[in-house]
Design a protein with these regions (language model features):
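Conserved glycine-rich cofactor-binding loop
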Residues: 17-18
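Residue(s) in the substrate-gating loop at a strand-loop-helix junction
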Residues: 145
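SDR active-site lid
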Residues: 175-240, 250, 254, 258
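Substrate-binding pocket helix/loop in short-chain dehydrogenase/reductase
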Residues: 101-102, 109-114
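Active-site helix of classical SDR
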Residues: 125, 161
Length: 269
């Protein structure tokens, strides 16, 4: 067992039960952070928390929360406060994806996507940015997406939520730096990543993306944490993703949207 060497360091990760979120947990545990694991799946959270506690000698706290519900972010914040925990590292990783034609997807599903991807993330960032600034600093990593760099037909609301996260996070990072707040705000923009989100039937149509085009969740999480701790405001993990992000500046938005629309309609099952 590796003993905790980061006393008084606590990280909160939303969407911690699977995929990139679970990898964030493993990496932070290895760095000696005490952990607050947040997601909807209590069994998965408890299993992961037990493994991390046993392997790394850290404290783990499980909070079951549906971040699409009203006041969920405030309820989560107060639950953490009641435990007397001082969060130094916040990772807003929870996210929902719904694919398909906008008019054919239910409005409720799309509002839920906005609630989690935008409202909950914004609320938690506001609550913890203020608290961290008042207590001497900290780190906030907001998981956006390469989808936020472009308009994507058949995935339009999701892409729009991630565009919000990207713009919001980069501008806030500049604000906090200019104010000498001691709070590092970072946007992580992964591309296609090998997680359950890619083939989750709840998302509607699924994308048939070759494995060769995907990064592992572990790679994405490693780059995100390292970049945030190094003071970067933007992280696009992987050479292929960096190339994709760069070419968005060389095509007109109209042409790029047409190309993406054709690609997504062909690759959606």
């Amino acid at each position: 067992m590796v003993m905790n060497t980061h006393k008084n360091k606590t990280a909160l990760v939303t969407g911690a039960s699977d995929g990139i979120g679970a990898e964030f947990i493993k990496i932070l545990a290895g760095r000696g952070y005490d952990l607050i694991l947040v997601a909807r799946s209590e069994d998965k959270l408890n299993d992961l928390a037990e493994k991390m506690s046993n392997e790394f000698g850290i404290r783990c706290f499980v909070i079951v929360a549906d971040l699409s519900s009203a006041n969920a972010a405030y309820d989560l914040f107060h639950a953490v406060e009641e435990k007397g925990l001082d969060v130094n590292f916040l990772i807003n990783n929870a996210g929902l994806l719904r694919n398909g034609f906008f008019t054919e997807l239910s409005l409720a599903d799309q509002e839920q996507m906005i609630a989690v991807n935008v409202l909950a993330l914004t609320s938690l960032t506001h609550l913890y940015a203020n608290k961290m600034a008042a207590s001497g600093g900290g780190h906030i990593l907001n998981v956006a997406s390469l989808a936020g760099w472009m308009a994507i037909p058949n995935q339009n609301v999701y892409a729009a939520t991630k565009a919000y996260v990207l713009a919001f996070t980069q501008s806030l990072s500049n604000e906090m730096m200019a104010a000498n707040s001691g709070v590092q705000i970072t946007a992580l923009c992964p591309g296609y990543t090998a997680t359950k989100m890619m083939d989750n039937p709840e998302q509607g149509a699924t994308l048939r993306i070759p494995a060769s085009m995907m990064m592992s969740a572990q790679e994405v999480a490693e780059m995100g944490i390292k970049g945030c701790l190094a003071g970067k405001d933007l992280i696009v993990p992987g050479i292929a993703n960096k190339f994709t992000a760069s070419i968005t500046h060389f095509f007109s938005k109209s042409l790029l949207t047409k190309l993406l629309g054709s690609f997504y309609r062909k690759t959606m099952g």
